[in-house]
């Protein structure tokens, strides 16, 4: 039963009957009632004052009175400053609960036959994944799962940036200082070894620039003329020309990085339907540049570089191809956008990329529109803010960037400390305890990064993220484990709970009603989350469900309830809460334990 729809249709009928006013359902604005007022649904009546020619209070009272008299849904109503707050009868809530309980796929929406491609992760093969990548991966994975649950056909793709000047920098550094070492000989993950040489390049390059600046007296020229950078630029040209020696080194070092990435992705529970490699797609971008030149959409400067003038759109002139013919960052996006459209024919292409690239994706959409691409208006940049760490709370190998692997390991240690202190591993084997620490660590990390609006910059506090009493992943995970423990005791006591709860003469406790209200909102919250590409909506909602259940659990007995009808209902309510928690946490990429 869709209570929102029932109420909106009743309100539509009320306006027709009381004011002879025909209003579309879309104009019936129902919102959750604020906690300080009685009721669960609030009608905003201000938009109707002009048409009805009476005050909001009069409208609200007349509509409320009509609904209480003419429908079976309304137990009572109250009016606060022109807002109509509605309280629903317990029989309606119970009917809604029974439908939810019997639906093993409750909350999932039917197919809408819309295709969406979600691109996320997009790492560079010159360093390990870091804290910023974690927010990216968690957002991309969660958005994909949420869209799929909301009825979309979703394809998760990863574009690996495996070529370009930044890759050549680590290669040049390895040629100078690698001395043939391998991940095995150093006991390092491959991505960490390659990242070490990227850092080495940067250190030596800065030293060269400083020395040249003193000689030339011009820091800008020094930055361009530093020998190490010029070596990297030569190597990039050699790579694009197909130099076999350069390609062999590139394949070897990238192979190390991929092995390292695979380990990290496995820890994170991140998967993709298709992986693209820039080395295989960047030439497509050059083809698009050639097309744009032929059409007159792009233009070539005297030095041979290719540009587009977007000043009429309020932007600027954008470089598309360097004078030496090498690609820039946007070149490959031109080609891969076409390729994705050919591969999937999506209705929407979502890019999960940090907000430092906001301008880049605005430019990309304008270029595709100028080229007449049919999908130009269907490109969506899911922009997100940076993630910071409290000063001094997390070690860093380079002093500025935190490795994902290092953060995961420290989170697992923190989870172990908290879990042992609280005595939540009694009866666990060593392996079971180890699995639990990993589940809690990842739950803490993922939930903390997903619960906040993606656009906001985020301060990640490892200790706060794993607080079992806070607004955290482990609090929700513990709620699920608590329900699972109750249901095991129900099974041990051989209590039958499959019969449907009769609606007549059944009075809900306010705490039970709170739980049902939160559960009933799940399908709507899922849809809102999907439409806004906002996992934070669902993350907050599952927290409210867990809180409502814990309030009920603290006050009302389940196993020792004497009224068998009430006990039956509370057991079933517990089953549904566990089901919805497990479903939502799965959509967020989080595992919930059965025991703690």
UniProtKB/Swiss-Prot annotation:
Which SUPFAM superfamilies does this UniProt record tie to the protein?
A: Anticodon-binding domain of a subclass of class I aminoacyl-tRNA synthetases (SSF47323), Arginyl-tRNA synthetase (ArgRS), N-terminal 'additional' domain (SSF55190), Nucleotidylyl transferase (SSF52374)
Domain of life assignment: Bacteria
Its GO CC terms are: cytoplasm
Task: List the subcellular locations.
Answer: Cytoplasm
Q: What is its EC number?
A: 6.1.1.19
Q: Which GO terms describe its biological process?
A: arginyl-tRNA aminoacylation
Q: What is its main location?
A: cytoplasm
User: Where is motif 'HIGH' region found?
Assistant: 123-133
Quote the subunit structure annotation.
Answer: Monomer.
**Which protein, by its recorded name, is this?**
Arginine--tRNA ligase
Source organism of the structure: Amoebophilus asiaticus (strain 5a2)
Q: What is the lineage of its organism?
A: Bacteria, Pseudomonadati, Bacteroidota, Cytophagia, Cytophagales
Gene of origin?
Answer: argS
